[in-house]
Amino acid sequence: MALEIEARDVIKIMLQFCKENSLNQTFQTLQSECQVSLNTVDSVETFISDINSGRWDSVLPQVSQLKLPRNKLEDLYEQIVLEMIELRELDTARAILRQTQVMGVMKQEQAERYLRMEHLLVRSYFDPHEAYGDSTKERKRAQIAQAVAAEVTVVPPSRLMALIGQALKWQQHQGLLPPGTQFDLFRGTAAMKQDVEDTHPNVLTHTIKFGKKSHAECARFSPDGQFLASSSVDGFIEVWDYISGKLKKDLQYQADESFMMHDDPVLCIDFSRDSEMLASGSQDGKIKIWRIRTGVCIRRFDAHSQGVTSLSFSRDGSQLLSTSFDQTARIHGLKSGKLLKEFRGHTSYVNHAIFTSDGSRIITASSDCTVKVWDSKTTDCLQTFKPPPPLRGTDASVNSIHLFPKNTEHIVVCNKTSSIYIMTLQGQVVKSFSSGNREGGDFVAACVSTKGDWIYCIGEDKKLYCFNYQSGGLEHFMMVHEKDVIGITHHPHRNLLATYSEDCTMKLWKP
């Protein structure tokens, strides 16, 4: 059952924040536009005491921020004017009588009452009986204090900050926010350090070891940079702390060893753009959608007749694009749980697919050596092209395609050759990068740095190749694993790479 919160209460919390931080103009504007009154004081007892003692210099600033019934406000201001006349503070009495809005309204609607104060003001003496009638000054104060106090309440100070603090503590308690983590309140995520300069990693920081009979088939960083997830041939999906290289035990389900998992090897994973959901695809053609914070499976799809080779969320997180060994790409609806679109036309495995940045097209890469561009709504194939063949002349399987950050109409195409290409969606080669290897160095995987300044490729020779976009040259290469490397992924904000291999390890690299 959803917890309902009154909109007026939210406004009052905002008004209190404005009041406590002396944002007086904002306070008045918000109160006027929303027609919501705060009507709080720090202490009712002190407020009553100030009225009973005639400490009007303390009472007036508080009253100016309250919405009181007009008759009670008039009684209060009348009492202040009479007491100022009694003290012969005639300038103050005159200013209140002639310059305040309350007295101005009284002059128009209760002329006789108003003129009585004007007459008392110009007299050379003060007669308490004439001013207060059968009552006394003290009794008048007490009556006003009692009447005004009924209109105000007391709430704890700094409610906005207190509520935010409580929310953050709850997130920590639930394992959603690791202790000691800086939090970006505006974005609603833990604050992440962002590397200013895009540069290639070359130092091994951590080696994550899997079981002797297990290795990672896929790994991905979350878009917010908080998580590194891996999926393995043993069916397990694990979330890692890339800073320590250890399993994230602040996720309670992992601390309890209740891991996300499939019955078959998990070949691919992908995060939603808000980093809240993780999709996983397995060798038996099934897809599962998980809540990354809780490890709860929220949706299952019998998506393909054969293994799922790649997954990609739509920008708004409402759809999931999948590819398979069954030669198709498909779009699934997360809310409906149904197949929405199917893309047929490849004659071999579809290895990878992505949405274009505006979501209007999808791009697929296949072992039939082609890249296809499709209309995501009509499923029409708009373009089919092949990357340039290797020097030996035969076409090569296309492993993956990647959006290029520097131009949304360009893609990075990795096929099983020793070259990688930046191409247009019409199939024209914009730029190419080559390792120079004639044999044994064909690329099996690739990724692009956040800003697009570096393109990273993994070769069959177990080496990482780092290409500089500006120079077009191979700036660095190094051996990264002892056995065949399966894939590579780049952190969204940091100069950090993760590589994973059949040697049962995943390695983290930084500059």
Curated annotation (Swiss-Prot):
Q: What happens when the gene is disrupted?
A: Lethal when homozygous.
User: What is the tissue localization of expression for this protein?
Assistant: Expressed in actively dividing cells, such as newly emerged leaves and root tips. Detected in embryo, female gametophyte including egg cell, central cell, synergid cells and the antipodal cells, and mature pollen.
Q: Which residues form the CTLH domain?
A: 40-92
Matching InterPro entries, A to Z? Answer: CTLH_C, G-protein_beta_WD-40_rep, LisH, SMU1, TPL_SMU1_LisH-like, WD40/YVTN_repeat-like_dom_sf, WD40_repeat_dom_sf, WD40_rpt
Residues recorded as bearing N-acetylalanine in the entry: A2
Q: Where in the cell is it found?
A: Nucleus
Keyword list (alphabetical) reads: Acetylation, mRNA processing, mRNA splicing, Nucleus, Repeat, Spliceosome, WD repeat
Question: Mind naming one GO cellular-component term on file for this protein?
Answer: spliceosomal complex
One GO biological-process annotation of the entry reads: mRNA splicing, via spliceosome
A Pfam match is: LisH_TPL
Q: Where are the WD repeats?
A: 211-252, 261-300, 303-344, 345-384, 393-434, 480-511
For the LisH domain, which residue ranges apply?
6-38
Top-level taxon of the source organism:
Eukaryota
Keyword Repeat in annotation: yes
Predominant localisation class: nucleus
SUPFAM superfamilies in UniProt: WD40 repeat-like
Q: Which PANTHER family match?
A: WD40 REPEAT PROTEIN
Query: What role does it play?
Result: Auxiliary spliceosomal protein involved in splicing of specific pre-mRNAs that affect multiple aspects of development. Required for proper accumulation of SMU2.
Give the quaternary structure.
Answer: Component of the spliceosome B complex. Interacts with SMU2.
- Family to which the UniProt record says this protein belongs: Belongs to the WD repeat SMU1 family.
Q: What is this protein called?
A: Suppressor of mec-8 and unc-52 protein homolog 1
Name the species this protein comes from: Arabidopsis thaliana (Mouse-ear cress)
Recorded name of the encoding gene: SMU1
